[in-house]
Structure formats: structure tokens, C-alpha cells
Amino acid sequence: MAKDSPSPLGASPKKPGCSSPAAAVLENQRRELEKLRAELEAERAGWRAERRRFAARERQLREEAERERRQLADRLRSKWEAQRSRELRQLQEEMQREREAEIRQLLRWKEAEQRQLQQLLHRERDGVVRQARELQRQLAEELVNRGHCSRPGASEVSAAQCRCRLQEVLAQLRWQTDGEQAARIRYLQAALEVERQLFLKYILAHFRGHPALSGSPDPQAVHSLEEPLPQTSSGSCHAPKPACQLGSLDSLSAEVGVRSRSLGLVSSACSSSPDGLLSTHASSLDCFAPACSRSLDSTRSLPKASKSEERPSSPDTSTPGSRRLSPPPSPLPPPPPPSAHRKLSNPRGGEGSESQPCEVLTPSPPGLGHHELIKLNWLLAKALWVLARRCYTLQAENKQLRRAGCPYQADEKVKRLKVKRAELTGLARRLADRARKLQETNLRAVSAPIPGESCAGLELCQVFARQRARDLSEQASAPLAKDKQIEELRQECHLLQARVASGPCSDLHTGRGGPCTQWLNVRDLDRLQRESQREVLRLQRQLMLQQGNGGAWPEAGGQSATCEEVRRQMLALERELDQRRRECQELGAQAAPARRRGEEAETQLQAALLKNAWLAEENGRLQAKTDWVRKVEAENSEVRGHLGRACQERDASGLIAEQLLQQAARGQDRQQQLQRDPQKALCDLHPSWKEIQALQCRPGHPPEQPWETSQMPESQVKGSRRPKFHARPEDYAVSQPNRDIQEKREASLEESPVALGESASVPQVSETVPASQPLSKKTSSQSNSSSEGSMWATVPSSPTLDRDTASEVDDLEPDSVSLALEMGGSAAPAAPKLKIFMAQYNYNPFEGPNDHPEGELPLTAGDYIYIFGDMDEDGFYEGELEDGRRGLVPSNFVEQIPDSYIPGCLPAKSPDLGPSQLPAGQDEALEEDSLLSGKAQGVVDRGLCQMVRVGSKTEVATEILDTKTEACQLGLLQSMGKQGLSRPLLGTKGVLRMAPMQLHLQNVTATSANITWVYSSHRHPHVVYLDDREHALTPAGVSCYTFQGLCPGTHYRARVEVRLPRDLLQVYWGTMSSTVTFDTLLAGPPYPPLDVLVERHASPGVLVVSWLPVTIDSAGSSNGVQVTGYAVYADGLKVCEVADATAGSTLLEFSQLQVPLTWQKVSVRTMSLCGESLDSVPAQIPEDFFMCHRWPETPPFSYTCGDPSTYRVTFPVCPQKLSLAPPSAKASPHNPGSCGEPQAKFLEAFFEEPPRRQSPVSNLGSEGECPSSGAGSQAQELAEAWEGCRKDLLFQKSPQNHRPPSVSDQPGEKENCSQHMGTSKSPAPGFIHLRTECGPRKEPCQEKAALERVLRQKQDAQGFTPPQLGASQQYASDFHNVLKEEQEALCLDLWGTERREERREPEPHSRQGQALGVKRGCQLHEPSSALCPAPSAKVIKMPRGGPQQLGTGANTPARVFVALSDYNPLVMSANLKAAEEELVFQKRQLLRVWGSQDTHDFYLSECNRQVGNIPGRLVAEMEVGTEQTDRRWRSPAQGNLPSVAHLEDFQGLTIPQGSSLVLQGNSKRLPLWTPKIMIAALDYDPGDGQMGGQGKGRLALRAGDVVMVYGPMDDQGFYYGELGGHRGLVPAHLLDHMSLHGH
């Protein structure tokens, strides 16, 4: 070195003083660096120790992971083996089941083959036996015939010949028996044995099962398979056929040997592996061929060989590698006792194996196959048992291996490894935390200012601190990376374990797959270890480089740079670091708000998305609403248009109606004027008629031909353009004064032609027959014969008619009842009666009992029949149908239409005077529609009828209201009449109606509703719509339908539309449908119980009523309503209640039944909070129940004064006639012992009408006929037409067990009644019990339901009762209901003291009759032992004199009428303006009437304390005066009605002390056979000549007679009965059951 060379630090060595401070600083820095280097080396040594420890820990973890992997692999392998064994076992079981089924099928086939072979052997044996017997018989005959051998003089040569012959026969027999037959038998047995061997081979070749059998075989049974062979061979010398026996024994022995060998082979095959199973089976089955061949030999050495072969084959039953198992017990039954083996006659003596030798020795071989199958089954069972034991051993070994491969220590090791792994993870985390803390400490130490230190030292310290911090962070990250690598290694280990578990290396031969898997895992681990070592070396090299760079930099820096440069660099670095720090702080400060803003923006975005979704949903909803609103607006506009058009049509219809009303008024005035004109014309024509009759009565007077017909040809008739009415010359001479009237009529006809009705004049009309009564209808044959008997001619049609109808000109023949000049008699005879009837039921005469059905007419319910004359003695009318057929009509199937109601036209008000001449084309329509002789009918125009009256042959009186419309409609009406349209609906003005009318609902429940209507034509079907959807199609003639399956509480809209054929659709019919809306009920009623049964109880006098309770849900409800219990009804009357929803039975005592002797059936109803259910299926009361009890003999009318709450009225009434008893000599008019009440008339109680609830009473088919009205108003005629339509509806339904729709109840029911009147009806002859109970009345709905049920049972029980024959029982039921309603009236005193005083005064002009007093017990306060009436009792009396005098005043006479049908003026009245003045009443209701009928056939009446008008045609007067000897009700319309009740049928009534009635007559016990009440359906006369001498002792019957029948029907079909006091035989087929109590 040069002398002036500078020092490394820039100081000269020659000047040490100047360089001392810098040297000190450098020295300090060197010491600091050395110190830092020492610390770094120490830290490196520590990190190396930690790294070594981590490597050791890693190796340990790898080893533990490897062990864990092996354990998991073993566990998965064991699971897989267990699953495989289970699947194998399942497959074996399935194969076993299939094999068992196949074996059973093969056994069945083999049994069938054995049976066939057995039958063949039996037949061959029988043939051999027959041949042997034949030979024996021949031999015997030969010996018998050879009689010289037995004689003493016979030679020895003949005897020798005989013996030789016998020997030849025996040899032949033996040859045939032991030769050919025995060979055949042996051959068949050998073939059978071959088949069995093949069968066994097939079974063993296809056997795969391993069933598990329990038990061990019976050694005695096993020994029995080998023992019988010597016995059989030793005992075979006694058999007659040794060859056959030997053959069988040899085959049996060979079979035993073969099967013993096969058993061993099967056992060994089962113990081997599955791969060699088929080869073992094949090798084991190859030995069967020599065995089958040896079985055909007949040597004795084979049994021994088989035994010798069986011994060495026995050890093969177990495998070499498995331990020897004891044989299982055989499932075969124990062998039979030795005595059974000696019985050769029983081939199936035992089921065991010891019975086989006996079966072989017998001629029949069926036991051989059975025994062989048993042995084969046992062998198979034994083989299966061996296989089962092998499976069990394998399972046990598998379990042991599983236990050895997965010990308890392995689980503990796994747990410890998991704990260690958790500890290592925590240690690594603590190391990372410690490194971070050291870094923070170093930063604080470096950043702290050191006093006396220069800035350059501080900068160097900071640089070293940062470098050290980086090194420490890198060193701290190394363990974390190792930890991650360990975790990745663990995951790879798990993946490898899963791959090993699912890979193909885990086979049964684990010697191949196990080492392969371990080798792969070790190789991967070694690779990972080498990579980790390389990583450690790389880290070490990086540390060494950092250390080398750190040591060389200060030396280079000291040599190459000055302190200033270092300082500047440090300052620059510091500034840059500060700038970076500030930037980082600013960026951090900016990042926090940005992060918050991002989160807020994200939250806002989510909210915006949710709001967008909600807005989209709202938009869709609003769009749907907008569409709906548009649709509703469109519908509203359409409805407004319809409404506007409807209003216009309504206004036009109103104007038309006003015009029609004006026309009707004018027409009525003209009609009255025309009524007077014919009367005047009659007087004028009477002398002319007499003169004409005198001319006709002259002898030799030729018949006059029609004058106009002979003079005017058909061409002139067709070509004429105006109607011409010609009169005959003599008419001008006779009736000249009427010529002006005729000219006026002809002028009016020329202006407006109209249809004229055909009519005939009757000079003298009886006042009893109304003038409007229709007469006979003409048939086509009669109408075409007008040229022979007609006295007038037809005229051409008018110009306004159609061409086709105008061109048809037919001659009209006068009716059978015509003028006196046509009859040819000297005096005018009376016109025969012509009535219009309606068929109530369908009737086919060929199905009836009559002898000549071809003379009767078939009827359809609703058809109209024209009746001529009166009913004959057999109960038949002579009638004519609408289509022209004539014949006999049974009277009990039809009902007369009232005279004021004629279908198709309203009646005329005056009689016609003569025949008329019609325009052409209208006579055919008149033949179809009018057919009247007393009047002429035209077309109906809103209730107006065009009447044409002809005064005589010189006068034509016509009345024209509308010329053009009616003339155009006439042809259409004619065609419609042919189509079957009802006549009241055909004639309309402008538009014809076809829509069904009077559409209303009935019996609306929660799930069903019944709809009825009145159809316009019974020949067209109707379509029923529900909510504008087609629901059903009803056939023609049906006017009701029932909707089923409806939802409760739902609004529905029902529509009924008529369906017309295509040819009728061309006509505009207007409205063709009718609509009605309804709402179903919310829920209920509950369902009725099922399986009702009535039985006698063990105790006498007690019945057990049991039923199946109704099904209820968890809430205890049925059909939506809460079930509260059950009610038991006997014949419609409640007898007890059971307050339990789950009750199933109850007891009824004899005392609970009010009239038990007459009740027949018991029903049960379900009670709920909303009412009761319908009746269940009734159960019959045992007939022997009432035989043991005698009904106590009580007075028929009694009252117990001690109980003021109730009283019972009992009086004898015959059920079929129901009237009061006649006066009795023992009956006193006034009893001094009574309470002082004078006797009044019986019907006085009926005359009162207190307010009571309106019970819905159904209109039966046999309602009362309406009276004829001589001069009624137009409104009355319209009402009658409506009434006819309503009857059409009622009569279209089935007559049997049908309830017509009832008129709805009227409001205003009175609830202020404090007492309740009940009626208990009984079928016993002669009793009706009326019971009045004081106390609050029932609720209206319950009372209404109870009355409906009683009435329904009564109506249903009446069944098929013809209206004409059932009138008596109808009025009997009417009277019964009247009694019931009037007994309710006894509770109220609504008539006041004045009327009560009036009723107490007896009528001076009425006879004192039999009285029945009903005493009111509510006012009695003192008990009495005697039965006496109360002081204020109401008395019911039966007047026998004139009509009852009752009214509002003393001088106002009043009559009593009974309502024949229901009437509601708001619905049925013809004049709606006067409907407010009319009264509402129901059928069978009693009404008080004052005065006579007014001009409109109305009475002034009182009903329900209201005074108003009632129509006379719907009521009948009750007259019980002295002039009526037969005690019948009299109707103004019908005359005498059938009798209500005859008192002759009773035994009598008396009034004892105390005014109580008792029954007179015999009081003996009731007979065992209860008498029955029946009604005669037809007339019967035993003395009419057809019976001959057999008519003695038989009763004559009239239709409607009520007969009391005793006992059953005899073998000839006759009952023994009583009628009118006479007893005798009555034919059973002419009687119908009748009762009033519902049965």
C-alpha cells in the first residue's frame, strides 16, 4: 500500500485523530452487525431444529395415515364381503324358491304319469284275471262234462287223458301269466325306473339352493331304508310270482345304491368352490347310466354291492377343510309299527320308508313312486342341510376376520392421531402469532430514536430491521406452508382410501391387490418427501445467499461510497417510504368509504330488485283487473242493449195487451149479444123444425142430398177467391126474418175470413149439462162420408190462407148428435153426454186381467180422452183418443176434466143453433182441435176464443177479432197438434210458445235439488242445464229432474230447454227455455242409520231396537252437522230418543207404545242441531210380540181429570169410512150427571178456523173435480186453464208412492198457541186417538217436518189407488186431517163469548144425534175418580138436520165447505187485481161460507179469521141434513161424493155416566189373525152366470167398497171377509190394501 493511500473510511492513517469518530461509528456498526449475525445464526439453528422436529412429526403423521388407510381398507373390505355374502344368500334363497316350485311342478307331472301307468297296469291285470277265470270256467265245465271219469266203470286211459288235458291248460295258463304278462310288467317297471332316474338327474343337475334346515335325521328312519331288503328277499318265497318280485327288489336295491352315491357326490360338490360346482354335478350324474342298466337285471348280488358302495361314500359328505358335522334330523314322520309292514292289502299303509317292501309285493304299484319321492326328498333335504352348515361356517369365519382386522386399539390410535393433529395445528398457529409479535417489536425498537446516534446509523438500522422482518416472515411462513402440505397429504390419503375401496383391487384374493395398493401409497409418499426435502434445501440456500449479501455489502459500501451518498440515499428512501406510507394511508382512508358506499349500493340494488319484482306483480294484477273491467263493461253494454230491447218489447207487449183487453171487452159484449141472438133464433126455428120433422116422417120420403155439393164441382171450389155460404131453398122459406142477419155475416166474412168451428145445435138443452160441454170427435172415415149424411157443403178458402191448405177441401159430417131433422124422428131426442177425461196413469190392456184387451184403449198419463155416455156396469167408459182410436176406457185410470176447462179453447157462453159452413182448409184443423157438437171453436189468442155460431141453415153468426194472424196460424196449429203439443199452449198470437212453464224447485238440500216444470209437449225431450252447461237429457213425457252431487252453500242457475226435431226448428218459437236460480243449503241433514233391527228381549214386553250408528268424523258431525243422538219412530210417531251420537241400540217397553197392537214397522232417525235425518230402512216388528199381550179394554173416549196437562180423545172410527156412529137407543141426548153442557152438533168444532200453521199437504192425483160454471168471467176461465196445466204436471208423474210438489207454506204462522194437539194414528179397526198436550208448542220447522213425515207415510202407503175408486179413502184421510186440525183449534178460544153462547144453543130444526164431547182439562182443578167433562168444554156434535147456522150474526146463515186442493191467489188467480180480496187455503181445510156464488163463481168465506172470496170450483160443501140418507158429502161440481164413514161398521157408541163414550158390543180377546181393511178395485158379481153354481157364499163387490178381511188367502185365491153386515168369500185379486196410518 502507498503511504498516501487513504483508509477505507476516507481518513488518512497518518492522521488518526481526524478519523477516530468515523472509526468508532464503524466499529459500533461492525459490532452490531456481528451481534445481529450471531442472533441470526441462533435463529437459524432454532429453525433447523424446528424443521427437523417438523420432519419427524411429518413422518409420524404419514405412518399414522398409512395405518389408518390400511384399517379403513380392511373395514371396507369386510363390509364389501358381508354385503356380497348377503347378496349371495339372497340369490341362493331365490334360486331355492324357484327350484322348489319347479320340483313341485315336476312332481305333479310325474304323479300324473304314474297314475296313467297305474291305470294301464290295472287294466292289463284285469284282462289277465278275466282270461284266467275264463280258463278256469272252461276247465271246470270240461271236468263236469267228463263225467265218465268218475264212474266206477271208467278206464284208466280216459282218466290219464283228462289229467294230461288239465296239465296242458295249467301250463298254458302259467305261460300266459308268468311269461308274456310278467315280462310286460317287468318292462314297464324298468321303464318307470328309468324315468325316475332321469328325473332325479334333472333335479340334481339344476339344483343350486342352500336351505337352512334344523334337526337331525332319525337313525331309525335311516336304518329303515336298508333293513327291509333282507326281509323282502327272505319272505319272497311265499309269493306266487317270484320273478316279478325279484325284478322289483333288484331295481329297488340298485336305486338305493345309486342314491347313496349321489348323496355323497352332492355333499362333496356343495362343499367345494362355486367354480367347480357344475363339473362336480356332471361327474356325479354320469354314474346313473350303469345304475339304470343294472336295475333291469334280476340278480341278488346288487343289494350287497349297493351297501358296500354306500359305506365308502359316506365320508364324502363333508369337505376336507371343514370340520365334520352331525347329520340333521329328517323332516319325515316316524316309521309305522312293524305290524303295518305285514299288511299286504294296504298299499299305502304308512308314509314312512319301511312300508315300501310291502308295497312292492302287492300287485298295485302306486306306493312305489310315493316312497321313492319321499326318499329323494330326504336326500335333497340332507344335501341342503350340508350346504346350510357350510354357509353358517363361512359366516362365522367372516365375522372372526372382521373382528381381527378392526381391533379396539386401532380406534384408540385413530383418536390419538386426531388429537395430535389438533395440537400441531395449534402449535403452528401460535408460532405464526409469535413471529408477528416479534416483527412488531423489532419495528418499534428500530423506529425508537437512539440518543447520540447519527442519522446514517438510524437509516442502516431501519434497513436491517426491515430485512430481518422479511426474513422472519419468510421463516414463519415456512411452517404454515408445511402445515398446508400436511393437510394436502391427508386429503390425498383419504382420496386414495376411497379409490382403494371402490377400485377393482379389493377382490377376494387380497394377496394381489393389497401389495399393489400399499406400493402405490408408499411411492406417492416418497415423492412428496423428496419434494419437501428439495424445498428445505432451497430455503437454506436462499438464507445463505441473504447472509452472504448482508456481510459483503457494508464492506463494499465502505470502500465505494461515502457517507454523504449513503445519507442521501437514506433520506431519499425515507422520503419515498413516507410518501408511500401516506399514500397507503390515504388509499386506506379512501377504501373504507368506498367499501361502505359499495355495501350501501349493493343494499340499494337488492331493494331495487325487490321493488321491481313487486311492481311487476302489481302490474300483472292491475292488467288482469283492467281486462276484467273491460270484459264487464262489454257485458254491461250487451246487457243494456238486451235490456233496451226487452223494454221495447215490453212496451210493445203492453200496448198489444191493452188492445187485446179492449178487444176482449168488445168481444165479450158481442158475445153476450150473440148469446141472445141464438135464443131468439131458436124460437123462430122451432116451428120450422117441426115442419121439417113432419116432412121427414112421411113414408117414402127420399133422403135429401147436400144441395151445394151436388151443384158446385171441385174445380169451382178451388177456383173461387171468396167464401160462399149457400142456403137451401126451404131455409129461405122458413126463416125469412133472419135473412138480413145472414147477409151481414156474409159481408163480414168477405172482408176478413176466419176459421169457423163445426157445431151442432140441440133444441132443448138440459140445465144440468152446461152448454159449453164438448161432445164427440169425428174420425177420418166419418169425416169423409159427408156426401151421404151431410146437409150442408164446404166452401172455398179465403185469399189470405196458404195455397196448400186452401186447396184442401173436405166435407164435414154432422155429429152423431145433430138436429132433429137429421135424426129422422118425430121428436128431438136428448143429446148424449160428452165429457173430456184425462188419463192419470199409464195403462196397457194386454197386461191386465181382462179377457178382451183388444177392445180397450192403451192410455198414457196426461192424454185427453173424449168419453161418450155414462160408465157401464163393468166400470168402463166408451171413449176416443186424440188420434181417433175408439174403445173402452177403465174408469179407475182416468179423471174427468172440469166442464169449465177444455184444452185448446175456452168455453162458449151460449149454445149453438146449428151446423156451419167453413172456409176450405180449416175443417181439418177443426177436426183435430174442436170436435164439439154443442159449440164451435177457433184459435186461442191470449185466452180469447173465436166462437162461430150458426143460427140455422139460413143464418150464420160469426165473430171475428183478428183476421190475418189467425188465418195464417191455423195450418201451423194443425201440424203442431199432430206433433203432440198440448192444446192450451198451441194457440198464441204472433209467436208460439214451446218453453217449459212453471219451473220451480223442490227438496233443495246441501247436495241435491229437484226441479219440476210443465212441458208444452209430452212428445219432445228436454235438456237440463246447470250453470249454462248441459247436465242431462230427460226423455219425452218427463217433467222433473234431480241434481245430485252439488256443493253445499253454492249458488246455481238451472235452465230447462225443449229439444225439437229438425222439421219443427224452421218455425220461430220464441223462447224455448226457462231458467231458475237457487242456493243449496249449507250442510245437513245428517245421514240416517243403517241396518235397523227389531228383536224381542229376554224380558217379556220389551223390544230391542238396534242399528248401525251413522259414520261421523273427528268433530262428531255427519254431512256437516253435529250429531246429538237418535230418535226411534214407530209408524211415523216418535216413541223414544237416545242422546248419544254413538249409540247402537235401545229398549222399548210395551207401555211406551201408544197403540202397539197395530204398529208394524220401526225406523230410526239421526238427530242433530239442525234437525233430524230421513227415515232409515224400516224394520218389521216380530209378529209374535203382540200375541203375548192383550190390549187393555179402555173406553173409546176418555179423559183423566187428575192430570190437567194432557187429555186424550179416543173414539172408534172405521179406518175406511171415518164417520160418526148412528143414533143409538142407549145414547141419551142430555146427561144430568154431566157438568151442565148441552149437547151440540159434532161438526160445530169443525166450523171454527183459528189461526194455525199451514202444513204442506201434497196434492194427490185424486183431487176433487172442479164444478162447472155456467156463466163465468174471462179471468175465471184463465184460472181454470192454469189449474189444468198444474194438474198436467201432477198427473205426469208416477202414481205409485209419489209425492207431487206441494205449495210452499204461507207466511204469517201464529206462534201464540199455548197448547199442542197431536194425533197418533193407528191401523186398528175402529180407533183414532187424538192427544192434546198443554205446554209450549214445538218449533215451526220441527212441527212442519213431523207433519210432513206423517202425511208422506200415509200417502206412500196408499200406493196405487185409482182416483175414481179411492175417493172414499181420500175423503177418509181428508176427514182424518180435518179432525187433527180441529183438535188443535181446541187449545184456543178465538171465537169469543158470543159465539160460544151461540154454539151452546141447539138448532131447533136439527135432530139430536150421537155426540162426542171433547173436554178441556186445562181448566179443571179438582181431581175426580169419574170421567167427567170440564165445565167449559167444547162439544163436538154431528148435526143430522139442515145445514149448520153459523156466522158473524144471528141472522146470517153459514155453510161449511172443505177445500179440494191448495189455492194461492197470488200465483193461481186469473185476475191479479182481485187477488188481494181472495183467501189462501189448503187442501182439506174447512171454510165457513155465507150466501151463494157470485157471477164469477166465487163464495164469500172466512178462513184463518180473514174474510174474502174463494173459488167455488176448488171447494165442496159438507151437508149432513136429514134428506141425505146415505150420509155423503155433496160437492157442487160432482154431486154426491163417496161416503166419509158409515156408522153401521161400528158396534155402537153410548154415553155413560159422566159423558164419556164407551164401546158397545163384544169385548172378547182379539183374534190371533189381525183383520185387514181392503178396498175393491173392480166390480164383482158372483151371480152373473159365468160362475155357474160356484157363486154361492161369495159377496158382490162394487168398485170402492171397503171390505174387512179375516185370515189369510185360501188355496183358490179368496179371502173370507165382511161387507155391509154380510160375510162370505171375496176374490183376492180384486182387492187392494188400504190404511190410514201409513202402512
Curated annotation (Swiss-Prot):
Residue ranges constituting the SH3 domain according to the UniProt record: 832-899, 1452-1520, 1569-1636
Keyword Repeat (UniProt): yes
Low complexity bias locations: 776-790
Stretches the record annotates as Disordered: 1-22, 215-240, 295-364, 697-811, 1251-1273, 1292-1330
Compositional bias ranges of the Pro residues kind: 326-339
Gene Ontology CC terms, in alphabetical order: cytoplasm; cytoskeleton; nucleus
Keyword annotations from UniProtKB, A to Z: Coiled coil, Cytoplasm, Cytoskeleton, Differentiation, Repeat, SH3 domain, Spermatogenesis
Stored Pfam families: SH3_2
Function: Probable component of the manchette, a microtubule-based structure which plays a key role in sperm head morphogenesis during late stages of sperm development.
Protein name: RIMS-binding protein 3A
Name of the gene encoding the protein in the UniProt record: RIMBP3
